[in-house]
Swiss-Prot record:
Keyword Nucleus: no
Binding site for ATP: P79, I80, A81, R82, G83, L84, G85, S86, S87, G88, A89
An MF annotation (GO) of this entry: ATP binding
Coiled-coil zones: none
Described purpose of this protein according to its UniProt entry: Catalyzes the ATP-dependent phosphorylation of L-homoserine to L-homoserine phosphate.
UniProt similarity note: Belongs to the GHMP kinase family. Homoserine kinase subfamily.
SUPFAM superfamilies, per the entry: GHMP Kinase, C-terminal domain (SSF55060), Ribosomal protein S5 domain 2-like (SSF54211)
Protein name per its UniProtKB record: Homoserine kinase
Species: Pyrobaculum aerophilum (strain ATCC 51768 / DSM 7523 / JCM 9630 / CIP 104966 / NBRC 100827 / IM2)
Alphabetized PROSITE patterns for the sequence: GHMP_KINASES_ATP (PS00627)
EC number: 2.7.1.39
Presence of keyword Oxidoreductase: no
Amino acid sequence: MKAPSTSANLGAGFDIVAVAHDAYFAEAYTAVGSGCGVHVKFKGYDPGPENTVTRSFKKFFELTGICRGVEVEVENNIPIARGLGSSGAAAVAALAAFIREAGIKTDPRAVIEAAGYGETAAAGSPHFDNVAGAALGGAVVLTSLSPIDYVKFSPRLIFVVGVPEVPPMPNKTKVMREVLPKSVEFKTYVRQTARVASLIAGLALSDPRLVARGMEDEVVEAARAPYVPGYARVRKYAFEAGALGVSLSGAGPSVIALVNEKEAEAVRDAVLRAYAEEGLRAEVKIASITEGALASL
């Protein structure tokens, strides 16, 4: 089973919005046997015994009352620690593969909750936005975190995704949360709420202009941007080349730009040029909204 890369937040939608795109995929294969427990093997790297996939399975067994002996192999082609939901996608792909192999029925919310809990292995605390996107596909808005609930939209949007080759920041998610402001002025709150409304309306209506307005963020992104190599230049060049909106993908360092189809290649080239002028190597892809791992179940 495959689970796609995701970009969470998309500007003002901090912790509640994610889009699934076809820039990268994680794949997982399972064999189900007797007993109760999970053994996970990662192709090409070893994240250790307490990884997101193992924790996700333990939580899934707890939530559903289902427990089988499961062998899991994960091939994760999503760049790790780049703000593209790699750890969550691996967990979602593995859970989806198990559900299919075991022939069981379950609520998608159980997968989202289990995989979100599994993120404690990578981020220190549960996160549900990326895993919801990887599981459901399209654009997902979390309407409740406890209990998990959501709405899913299927907008037709095109993005340019820039992934710089920079040294991974230790405990990136934790660090990038610590830099966030503890409070904001009321006027800022009102402006930010308007942006969130625009973002969600744009995703629901497949309206790029509304989505782009919601990709502006003066709270979270303003605090994080100084820690992201090359971001200011990438953002500037992308807009000059015709991007409609630009934001960090998750906590970065990857960047996602919303584009019209006719400007996609120009924006991709501009983002590559911006990284080059910053002395950074990068992979930059044109990507579209895609389905999640649970779509075929």
